[in-house]
Amino acid sequence: MIAKIKSRVDFSGIVNYANNVKEKSARIIGSNGVLLVDNSTISDSFQAQLRIPDANGKLHHLSKPVKHVSIAFSPEDVARFPDNEDGDRFMAQLAEEWLLEMGIDPANTQYVIARHFDKKHPHCHLVFNRIANDGTVISDSNEHRRNEAACRRIKQRHHLTFGNS
């Protein structure tokens, strides 16, 4: 398992990529706090959250409020992620565990997890809002160091293949 984190300015572009049914054979396998009618309503849900004021009543002005995490698993673990409900559920569980390992409460965070089938290795895309449901900002301080540790713990816990990252 390898997770690559990118910061984004705009929700609509990354939502359209993550949930690209035509080119990526994508399907949503997990979410919280977003309307899943279509990509536009997903993006609008994220955008609305940016208007939640902080504890002092001020709006946040993050230059990059969007986090996009590409979570890839080893081809050796493909049998752990069958193309069915069980495989989707397990992959979504691991993405939610990644959030927790990063110190992010999935119950207090808007996110969507989309599974892709355009590569030989199992993978998904996690898009989340840096403005939590309670109006606080989700820290991205030391996220690369925390990410490495989170992936290592999840791989150990679930006996996933270790490889070069």
What do these predicted ranges mean?
Residues 1-165:
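N-terminal nicking endonuclease/strand-transfer module with a His-rich metal-binding environment
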